[in-house]
Amino acid sequence: MKQETNTPNAFTSSELLQCDVSGATSPTTRTKGTRGGSEPRDGVLQEIGGVNAMPAATWGWLKMNQTKLELSDELAAAPAEAVEVEGLDEQFAGSADAFDAAMDAMAERFPERRTAAPGDAADRARITPETELNVPATSVYQAGAIKLEEELAPAEAFETGMGEAAYTYLAGHATKRIVIDVPAYGRATVTARVSGVDAAAAIAAIDVVARPQATLDLQIALDSPVAGEGVVGSVLRVCAHEYATVNVTCTQTLDDSWIALDDTGLFLDEGARVNVQHTVLGAGASATGLAGDLLGDTAKVTIDTDYLGAREQVRDFNYELRHRGRKTECEIDANGVLTGTSKKVYRGTIDLVHGCKGATGTERETVLLANKGVDNKTVPVILCDEDDVAGNHGATIGHVRDEQLFYLACRGLDQNAAEDLFIRAKLEDAALSATDERTRAAVVRLGNNLIDNFEEELA
């Protein structure tokens, strides 16, 4: 497989973040200087590589295998008030180690490892020096997958979508740690609101343990009610026990001067259900990653993503769902609009692991390109090591034709006004489907900053 050795042009938001596909995977630092015509700023940038990396890399020249973050070392820790928690009653507040303890206990629930298959330990033991040249080599991904399936307990195999380096940064800079432990047959509704603080990192670290047949509705709101620049984000870990249901809604309404980081990891036991809604509307640069381990039979994950890219904004997505249980299901749907000179990378990987008989996975993306200046990259991937499975993937890309723009121009709408129509439609949909009044108000605030008379016409 081709190795990545080039470093393409990077993107930046307030000189704090860049994206490329260089091979670096460990944090490094460099002095911050002038880039892209921006005013010089003193300080040091911390580079975090291997972010939102695809589990099985594709061609390096596509420049979409992974992302690199550059975050200022001078960002202060946001005050605790930057993260508000609503609805977390004492009966649902878990101990600090509740998630780790729950994952450790899964080793007893799932003691078995990979069943016999080509490339397993027994197969490798039969290889002799005389025959090894006749045996097909395994890729880096295949070797890692075999190790995961043969040797790693559920807790060791657990991962988040943005990767280990990004998780370490987010967890290490968490403004507030929230542990939600819903008892068996219980039901809880919890909201976490993260507000941007100028020159600071405001991050909510959330652990969720949903006991057997429990139900949790979790809303996460990332917003910037005051002017400034910095990092706003969340890192979420979910352990869903047998037949538990976890519904996660994350709405991001930051202004362009902010960076948004949203990292999620899921573990599903038998019959568990996790439904995720990502709504990405603002931030000059945003990175969203989600990884799910469907180890229990008949577990199901549903992901719906709505996004908007405008002006010079950058959107970066990575979804990885690993099917290990029998008759597991996943559905990934993404729908977005790109205008101006915005950029977007979408990676969606469904991994049908050996032994997941009867599993089905579907991923779809629909994106409207409203300007010829946008940069759109989409890579839906199906990895398969089982025969009795079904995997479906596809992407639909539409654009506004010149004759349509001419028609609008004849009626007094120039290119910018035409793009505002699509931006308004996406924001109106988000406002109407907001989970509560504060989230709706945040969408309206963002809309008012982008479009004239947004609130008046919405009403």
Whereabouts are the PLM-identified features?
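Short, low-to-moderate order helix/coil transition modules at the start of elongated helical scaffolds
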Residues: M1-T245, C250-Q252
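Conserved beta-strand/loop scaffold segments within soluble protein domains that form the structured core
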Residues: C19, R41, Q46-E47, P55, ...
